[in-house]
Regions:
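Glycoside hydrolase catalytic-domain context in secreted enzymes
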Residues: 17-633
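Positively charged n-region of N-terminal signal peptides that target proteins for export
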Residues: 1-4, 515
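Alpha-helical transmembrane segments of integral membrane proteins
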Residues: 4-7, 470
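Bacterial N-terminal signal peptides
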Residues: 7-16
């Protein structure tokens, strides 16, 4: 009996020493899980695990590469509490991950869908939702949990470097299209992050610029689209922007992230910073910015010290932790989804080809130039961009795709004949130009920036004569690309001397022979057309149509489909006609200081601060207020 009692007491002691089992996320309440977390675990959970390829105070752990190579960030796992890491990856024209992996013969290319401006030009919410479903499927099947998209900042000025990602100068169009995109993505059981909240309308000094704006303009123009998206699609997350708004960082702004977003709009998801955004981790936690990405060691230290010193009440940190855990509970990684790494890329290519045609805008079409007549078989194809088509912009909005269909390829796929000698001239010229046009590799984020385009090739009189004799019609493509860290130059809005000479020469030669000229605009942002629009017979605004761009444009040119796009941004006669142009950085240099290490702030207009003096009169609202203004198109 004594022996049995001894073993019973021994077993009880062992159980007591082990203590109760730790609560598990998904099995126990979120509150119980938070109650079991150490302060250090809480601090880790609200900051990311680092970003591969960065160093110094930017890296915390750097496990991003171990989950989905090329993804933008991950969260901190706590296995003892059943908390997995989840993956956040860039968009919005498609998932951006590494297509090639070390020691792996498989490829992981994603579909490059049309840019945001083109999708918005469809004015078709059902179509955008279908595109979102396809993108969301790739997010799911490649093992990501949250797509860092859509981007719905307002097209305040034609020169913004990331206008291609954004939808419109109109907040209603922006909000409705964003909501449709979010619904499509999230129908796959993966999340979105509507961005950049808010008033992030220039790339120049975006990490420190102070947007000075009236409450009315803020509400009616720059926040309205976000409000629509929040209320009509319930995005899982919102991404705060880099910039200040009236003197306060967006990621440290309690009125923006808590009072308005949560209390007024009833947003129930998580708020995440843009990568390296903000300065004060404690202020960000207090404001309601729940997660700091990609995560920096000094942010962890600030949060720990903030709680210990009383500057950050632990109940506030618990609130942020709860929102992160509620996000994780929804994700495929938490649900242990067995992703295939094999989405149906062929089906998604068909989606991008078809969807792009609906957003193309026919700006001019004299004498029924388009669609091509059936007798048109031979095409004189001019312009470097015809042979080197632009799928989309650069930076986090780019997609690592398997291919891009050029206009040359699209026309040939449809059975049109292209002169081989002219093709060879262009290909040799483009190859030589591309060797000269390289980025400064010393810049830490140069891979995100746009590569300079080739100077336009002007055909000789002999070449023109040969093409007029051979071809039924002339087609000229003009291209523009843009991306992160730098806004477009004034010269990018206007046509170069070489481009103007090309248009004049081709138009004169072909019109003299009674043959027509078509211009295709493969652009991500508005350009000037007033000075040359009378030269060609037709102008097709193709935007940047994704990886199937050449096929999509050919479908329109041939009459297989009708271009049904509508402009979402005004094409002004001159850049300075735009109300915001006096308060926008012109030809400013790129700034890749994503960590904003410079504490001293100067007072350079339109760089350190930008006055939104046009107030609510953005785009067409301004032009409609004038007594008389003849819009370019």
């Amino acid at each position: 009996m004594k022996k049995q009692l001894f073993y019973l007491l021994l077993a009880t002691g062992v159980l007591s020493a082990c203590g109760p089992a730790a609560p598990q996320l998904g099995k126990d309440s979120v509150e119980d899980v938070i109650g079991a977390m150490t302060l250090e675990e809480k601090a880790h959970l609200v900051i990311g695990t680092g970003m591969v390829g960065t160093s110094g105070d930017s890296t915390v752990i750097g496990t991003t590469k171990k989950l989905v190579p090329g993804a933008a960030g991950t969260t901190y796992p706590i296995p003892r509490l059943g908390i997995p890491a989840i993956v956040l990856a860039d968009g919005p024209a498609g998932l951006r991950i590494d297509p090639i992996r070390e020691g792996d013969s498989a490829t992981y290319y994603c579909t490059h869908f049309p840019i945001g401006t083109l999708l918005a030009s469809t004015w078709n919410q059902d179509l955008v939702e279908e595109v979102g479903k396809s993108i969301g499927n790739e997010v799911l099947e490649y093992g990501a949990d949250v797509l860092l998209a859509p981007a719905l900042n307002i097209h305040r000025n034609p020169l913004c470097g990331r206008n291609f990602e954004y939808y419109s100068e109109d907040p209603l169009v922006s909000g409705k299209i964003a909501a449709a995109y979010v619904r499509g993505i999230q129908s796959n059981g993966v999340g979105t992050s509507i961005k950049h909240f808010a008033v992030n309308n220039q790339e120049t000094n975006r990490n420190a610029n102070d947007a000075r704006i009236t409450p009315r303009a803020l509400r009616e123009i720059y926040l309205k689209g976000f409000e629509i998206a929040v209320k009509e699609s319930a995005p899982w997350t919102v991404m705060s922007s880099y910039n200040h708004i009236n003197g306060t960082y967006a990621s440290e702004n309690t009125d923006l992230l808590s009072t308005l977003l949560r209390d007024e709009w009833n947003f129930e998801g998580m708020v995440v910073t843009d990568w390296f955004g903000g300065k004060d981790a404690v202020a960000q936690m207090i404001a309601g910015n729940d997660m700091l990405q990609p995560g920096r060691a000094n942010q962890y230290d600030m949060i720990i010290e903030g709680v210990k010193s009383g500057k950050l009440d632990e109940s506030i940190l618990n609130r942020n932790v709860k929102r992160v855990l509620e996000l994780i509970l929804q994700t495929p990684h938490f649900k242990e989804y067995k992703y295939s790494n094999k989405p149906d890329l062929k089906a998604h290519a068909a989606v991008t080809r078809q969807s792009a045609t609906e957003g193309m805008v026919l700006l001019k079409n004299n004498n029924e130039t388009l669609p091509f007549e059936r007798k048109v078989r031979n095409i004189a194809l001019f312009g470097c961009t015809s042979y080197d088509f632009i799928a989309g912009g650069t930076g986090s909005g780019n997609v690592n795709r398997a291919y891009t269909v050029s206009l040359l390829d699209g026309l040939k796929n449809a059975g049109y004949q292209i002169d081989e000698a002219l093709k060879a001239d262009y290909e040799q010229y483009i190859e030589a130009e591309n060797k000269k046009n390289t980025l400064d590799s010393s810049q830490p984020f140069s891979r995100f920036m746009p590569v300079p385009r080739p100077t336009e090739l002007i055909p000789t009189t002999k070449v023109l004569s040969e093409q007029v004799a051979k071809a039924d019609v002339a087609l000229v493509t003009l291209g523009r690309t843009s991306g992160e860290f730098v806004d477009r130059n004034v010269s990018d809005f206007e046509l170069s001397e070489e481009e103007l000479q090309l248009l004049k020469s081709v138009s004169q030669a072909f019109h003299a022979a009674g043959k027509k000229v078509v211009v295709v605009l493969n652009i991500g942002g508005v350009i000037e057309t007033a000075s040359w629009k009378k030269l060609p017979d037709a102008i097709l605004l193709a935007w940047q149509a994704g990886q199937e761009g050449g096929n999509s444009v050919t479908d329109v040119l041939s009459g297989k489909v009708s271009p049904s796009g509508k402009l979402t941004m005004t094409f002004p006669n001159k850049l300075m006609d735009v109300a915001s142009s006096t308060n926008f950085p012109m030809d400013a240099r790129a700034n890749t200081d994503v960590r904003n290490k410079e504490d001293k702030r100067s007072s350079v207009k339109n760089v350190d601060y930008t006055d939104y003096e046009e107030d609510i009169f953005v785009g067409y609202r301004y032009f409609a207020s004038l007594t008389a203004y003849f819009i370019n198109i």
